[in-house]
Design a protein with these regions (language model features):
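Non-catalytic accessory segments adjacent to catalytic cores
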Residues: 108-110
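Helix-start/capping segments and mature chain N-termini
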Residues: 1-93, 101-105, 131-334
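Short, well-ordered coil loops that connect the C-terminus of an alpha-helix to the N-terminus
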Residues: 112-113, 252
Length: 334
C-alpha cells in the first residue's frame, strides 16, 4: 500500500486545482469572512473543516436570484436569513447593511448578470465540539453560481409527485432555513426511486405541508387559490410573492379567492390544479400525485398565469429588484 503523501502548502494548492471537477465552471465567485474577501478560482472556494456549519450543521442560509444584473427580492431573503439566525441562536458577524453590501459586491465580482447568489451564516470555526462557545466568531460565506435549470417538461407536461414516507421536520426546525437538509434530500431520493419528480410532506394530522424545498399550492374546483398556513413550514419568499399575484387574479376575475388554511390530503387530491412554488423552480404545475391525476391531468391555466407573472416581476418590479454595482468592482493586487 502506497504511503499517503504529506503536502507542502504549494503542493496542496496545486492538488486542489488539479482536483477541480467539470461542474466547477459554474461557480463564479465566493466571499469568505475567514479570508476577508472574494475569490474567483473554484479551487479556493473552500470552508474550514472545523467550521461548525460543516460538522454540526449549526448554520443558516438563503438564496437570491440574479437576473439581468439585478438581485430579485434580496431584502426579503436577507431578512429571512437574519430571522433564521435568531432562531438558530447565531450572532451576526456584521450589521445587516454590511451583509447586504458583501452579497452585492460578491455578485459584482462574478461579472455575471444571471445566476443564483447563496449565502450562509455559521457559528464559525474553532474546534470539533458541539457547542459554539469554542468558535472564534460567526462566519459568513457567499457564492455566485449558475442557477439550477429544471426540465422544460415540468412546465410543458407537468410534474409527478408522491407522498413521502420521510418524517416531516418539527415546526421549530421547519421554520428555520438551516443547513440541516437531510430530510429534504431523502424526500427527493425517495421520489426518484418511485419514478416521480418530487415528494410531498404530510403532517401527523394528515394535512399537506410542503415539498422537498418548495411550497405546495392548489386551485380548488371553485377557483380558490389554497395554501397551507406557515406555522409549521418554511415561509417561502416566492410563495408570498405568488400570493400577491393570486390576489391580483382575484381582482381580475381569474380566481374567486385566496385562502391560507389547513388542507386535508383528500381535499387536495380533488383540486383542479396543484403546483410547486420556489425561487428556483418558480411555479411548476403538478399533474399527478401518487398515480392519481390532478384535475384533467394537464398543466392548468392558473399555474401558467402565475409563472408568467413571476417572470414579468423578475424583470420589471422595481420595488423587488436591487442593482448589482458592477462598476464598483475592485480586485486585490496581492
Amino acid at each position: 500500500m502506497a504511503q499517503i503523501p504529506v503536502f507542502t502548502t504549494e503542493q496542496a494548492i496545486d492538488g486542489l486545482r488539479q482536483a477541480i471537477h467539470g461542474k466547477a465552471v459554474n461557480f463564479y465567485a465566493m466571499y469568505s469572512s475567514i479570508l476577508g474577501g472574494v475569490v474567483t478560482d473554484p479551487a479556493l472556494m473552500v470552508v474550514p473543516l472545523d467550521d461548525h456549519m460543516v460538522h454540526r450543521g449549526h448554520a443558516v442560509f438563503d438564496t437570491a436570484t440574479l437576473t439581468h444584473g439585478m438581485l430579485y427580492q434580496l431584502d426579503a431573503h436577507l431578512d429571512r436569513l437574519i430571522k433564521s439566525a435568531e432562531g438558530a441562536r447565531l450572532p451576526l458577524p456584521f450589521p445587516r447593511q454590511q451583509l447586504r453590501q458583501i452579497i452585492l459586491e460578491t455578485a459584482a465580482a462574478s461579472q455575471r448578470r444571471d445566476g443564483s447568489v447563496r449565502y450562509w451564516l455559521s457559528a464559525g470555526p474553532g474546534g470539533y465540539g458541539l457547542g459554539p462557545a469554542e468558535c472564534i466568531g460567526s462566519s459568513f460565506y457567499v457564492i455566485v453560481f449558475k442557477q439550477e435549470a429544471y426540465p422544460q417538461s415540468y412546465y410543458q407536461e407537468g410534474m409527478r409527485l408522491v407522498t413521502s414516507q420521510v418524517p416531516i421536520k418539527p415546526p421549530l426546525f421547519a421554520r428555520i432555513k438551516s443547513t440541516n437538509y437531510l430530510p429534504n434530500v431523502l424526500v427527493v431520493l425517495e421520489a426518484k426511486e418511485r419514478d416521480a419528480d418530487n415528494g410531498v410532506f404530510i403532517d401527523q394530522r394528515g394535512m399537506v405541508a410542503e415539498s422537498s424545498n418548495m411550497n405546495v399550492a392548489f386551485v380548488t374546483q371553485d377557483r380558490v387559490f389554497r395554501h397551507p398556513p406557515f406555522d409549521a413550514i418554511l415561509a417561502g419568499i416566492t410563495i408570498h410573492r405568488v400570493l400577491d399575484f393570486a390576489q391580483r387574479l382575484v381582482q381580475q376575475g381569474g380566481l374567486n379567492g385566496v385562502r391560507l388554511a389547513d388542507i386535508p390530503v383528500e381535499e387536495a387530491r380533488n383540486a383542479a390544479e396543484m403546483m410547486l412554488i420556489g425561487s428556483s423552480i418558480k411555479v411548476a404545475p403538478v399533474v399527478e400525485w401518487d398515480g392519481q391525476k390532478i384535475g384533467d391531468g394537464k398543466p392548468g391555466p392558473i399555474a401558467a398565469k402565475l409563472l408568467e407573472m413571476w417572470n414579468e416581476d423578475t424583470q420589471s418590479a422595481n420595488d423587488q429588484l436591487v442593482g448589482v454595482p458592477y462598476e464598483q468592482e475592485t480586485r486585490g493586487t496581492a
